[in-house]
Amino acid sequence: TGGGLIPEGRPNPGIVHTIAMSGNEMPTIYRIEIQTLAGTGKLLVSGPLSREPVRIAFDYFKAHASRVSGSIRAGEHDFHLHLVDLQGGGEPDVSTLASLIALCSGALGRPVQSQLAIMGDMSLGGVITPTRNLAESLQVAFDAGAKRILLPMSSVGDIPTVPGELF
């Protein structure tokens, strides 16, 4: 269950929902929240997640922010990234891609689409990796209220494993 964990309406800028495998190897819903403040380009991380994936996202964000928008000045702001485990699953196995999208949303002051769930991950070099357990992850996302899924192209080959009733 978990209906309503991904609420209707546009989220505030810097807030994204992601589906990742938790410590118990179950697809779990997480919310990433970014707070952007005037500063010098520092990152503070809180919540039940490994700092390494967030550091990769932040380093990529700082290196490539101008490719997203010329108005992003990563060195003129500090960012606080907080992860909320919405289903009690513990630390997620992936969080880099969703963290990057949350950082961009927060820095631009623009929300992501309503009821969006982000899947997949990203390497330091920007390579997007596929979603693990695609069918289960989609089911969890839809049960939680997601109406839109951001899915890596690298997961397209797994679409035939998804039951038709999920589409």
Language-model region placement:
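Peripheral, non-AAA+ core regions of ATP-driven protein-machinery
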Residues: 2-18, 23-167
